[in-house]
Amino acid sequence: MEFSVSQQIELVKNEVKDFINHKHLTVVPKVHYETVVNIGTSIICTKYGIGYPGGSFVQSVVNNDLMRTFSTADATNRQYIDLYCKMLYNIPNP
């Protein structure tokens, strides 16, 4: 059975939430939780070509471009670059 793009994105989003909630030591406060889930989902979807590619920050994380990652990250995302990198290498293609 083949999943639609929206179903694939929802699968990735659930994997990202599971990773944040159960598989990583970084505590994401409620105030940042939705942002981190959305950016993490965009990173994984961009990596696997699901839907449309993410913006400049997401592209720089996926492309392993450290300087661009830090220069395009806002204050919130800068705190979670380590988490995003761990997601990138530990969340499989849905």
Language-model regions, residue ranges each:
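Extracytoplasmic/secretory-pathway segments with low complexity and glycosylation-like composition
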Residues: V5-K17, N64
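Residue-identity detector for glutamine
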Residues: Q7-E10, E34, Q59, Q79
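Generic structural hydrophobic/aromatic packing signal, biased to beta-strands
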Residues: V16, I43, I81-Y84
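Amphipathic alpha-helical interaction modules
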Residues: I20-T72
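Amphipathic alpha-helical binding modules
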Residues: F70-P94
